[in-house]
Regions:
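Binuclear metal-dependent hydrolase catalytic cores
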Residues: 1-67, 75, 149-173
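Conserved acidic
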Residues: 71
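Cap/insert and terminal regions of metallo-dependent hydrolase folds
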Residues: 56, 63-65, 74-168
Length: 173
């Protein structure tokens, strides 16, 4: 299945190089559980069409729940599984910060990438509807953006500031 997805990504996203897509993949069912010591992990399919096999994850300890959206547009599966999470870690496509670049990033490429991710004007709604306590944003597209503006957009729907994720960030749950 991975070969067909790899081919689809290259064609759909109009990538110049496919070197970053060469890695080993292990496939599993659409939904299920994994237990690691005292942590129960639920994996569930999210909507990243046309690319198949995208998953979110909920981690359960005795008293806490952390949900990771995975690469997805807003979808029912995420909303169900993220309910009442102490932390929702969610990707975000910051559409107002990304522009066409001649020969590199076409208008169609931007449209196609936005189509299967969660735009900044919707991620706060997802967090609010999931009733999460904290929202941590990550997997930023583009990687450089106005943090204050993003927080303001998300706060409008979520009702509080999101946490802007970064490498090695520690969050008390």
């Amino acid at each position: 299945a991975w070969k067909s997805e790899r081919k689809l990504r290259i064609s759909y996203e109009r990538r110049k190089s496919s070197k970053a897509l060469n890695y080993k993949v292990y496939e599993f069912k659409k939904e299920g559980f994994i237990n690691i010591n005292d942590i129960k992990i639920k994996y569930f399919e999210v909507d990243h069409k046309p690319v198949p096999y995208a998953y979110g994850f909920s981690f359960f300890s005795k008293k806490k729940k952390l949900t990771i959206s995975g690469d997805t547009r807003p979808c029912e599966s995420l909303m169900i599984n993220a309910q009442n999470s102490d932390v929702l870690l969610h990707e975000v496509f910051i559409e107002y910060e990304i522009n066409q670049i001649s020969g590199l990033r076409s208008k169609k490429t931007l449209h196609n990438v936005k189509e299967y991710h969660t735009p900044s004007n919707l991620v706060g709604k997802v967090a609010k509807l999931s009733n999460c306590k904290k929202l941590v944003l990550t997997h930023f597209v583009p990687t450089r953006f106005n943090i204050s503006k993003l927080k303001k957009i998300v706060r409008k729907d979520f009702g509080k500031d999101p946490i802007i994720g970064n490498d090695l960030l520690t969050i008390n749950i």
